[in-house]
Amino acid sequence: MSRIKAILFDMDGVLIDAKEWHYEALNQALKLFGCEISRFDHVHTFDGLPTKDKLELLGKVSYLPTELHEFINQLKQQYTMEIITQKCKPLFQHEYALSRLKREGYLLAVCSNSKRKTIIEMMERAELLEYLDLIMSNEDVEKAKPNPEIYITTMKKLNLQPEECLILEDNKNGIAAAIASGGHLLKIDTVYDVNYTNIRTKLQSI
């Protein structure tokens, strides 16, 4: 085994192909108030941010009163859970990768800008929850990605140094957080890049 002792996974776009779900759910909530995010802006400006931060950004560029943000956020979470119930399914290559890495002795964690309830629901439906040693959500930190706090806090909870951790990330905010944390980075383009072979190859290169 390499000197890596833990593998830290982002969730959306890494373990779960959920970017479109968040886009659909947020716009469903926003449309009730005459607002909408384009698909381009969601990918290039809002990708990887917590809903609270997305709404704060929207408030600066459009007429979206601050007093509506919490209500819209709650609506968005409700719509997201409805979509998860319909669409979130296990992906064999992820089950195989995490189960094998777990057997090999690696600590496994999910570090996501999503809410804890959403993470647990997705991980249960993807049949990955049993392999995780730790779940970190946006509710566990003061500053979400691109701030590295979530990764630094995870490393401390696992009692590990940054150089002992491999982080899998897919978007600019997550990648910035991973790099700033000092951990090793495996950049992911799609959820299908997350497989045992790719992770093992990266581990052997460290």
Tell me what each language-model feature is.
Residues M1-I7, E95, S99-K102, K115-I206:
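Asp-based, Mg2+/Mn2+-dependent phosphohydrolase catalytic module
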Residues S2-E95, S99-R100:
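N-terminal helical cap/lid subdomain that shapes the substrate entry/recognition surface
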Residues V14, S112-S114:
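Conserved phosphate-coupling serine/threonine residues in phosphotransfer and NTP-handling enzymes
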Residues D17, C88, V110, E164-L166:
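Residue-level marker of alpha-helix boundaries and capping positions
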Residues C35, Y106, G183:
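Short phosphate-binding/catalytic loops that engage adenosine nucleotides
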Residues G59-K60, M81, T85, Y106, ...:
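A broad detector of the eukaryotic-type serine/threonine protein kinase catalytic domain
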Residues A109-V110, K187:
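Hydrophobic beta-strand core positions in alpha/beta domains
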